[in-house]
Curated annotation (Swiss-Prot):
GO terms for molecular function: acyl binding; acyl carrier activity. The gene is acpP. It is found in: Cytoplasm. One of its GO terms (cellular component) is cytosol. It comes from Chlamydia trachomatis serovar L2 (strain ATCC VR-902B / DSM 19102 / 434/Bu). Carrier of the growing fatty acid chain in fatty acid biosynthesis. GO terms for biological process: lipid A biosynthetic process. It comes from the Bacteria. This is Acyl carrier protein. 4'-phosphopantetheine is transferred from CoA to a specific serine of apo-ACP by AcpS. This modification is essential for activity because fatty acids are bound in thioester linkage to the sulfhydryl of the prosthetic group. Disulfide bonds: none annotated.
């Protein structure tokens, strides 16, 4: 499974959305109807899965699925 597929699977599971709705340019708030609690839980799950911490400032900048994928690519060991 690719990084993109892993991230999308986590988003589908955490937000309870359809896999077809999760695209690289999908906005968590506008397209996937996530609220701040959803986003906090999503960040915690991503941190656990990919074994690194996402700072609060960085988390606020992660607005789309693509933002998350790019962030993980840049911060993985």
């Amino acid at each position: 499974m690719s990084l993109e597929d892993d991230v999308k699977a986590i988003i589908v599971d955490q937000l309870g959305v359809s896999p077809e709705d999760v695209k690289v340019d999908s906005s968590f708030i506008e397209d996937l109807n996530a609220d701040s609690l959803d986003l906090t839980e999503l960040i915690m799950t991503l941190e656990e899965k990919f074994a690194f911490e996402i700072s609060e400032d960085d988390a606020e900048q992660l607005r789309t699925v693509g933002d998350v994928i790019k962030y993980i690519q840049e911060h993985q060991n």
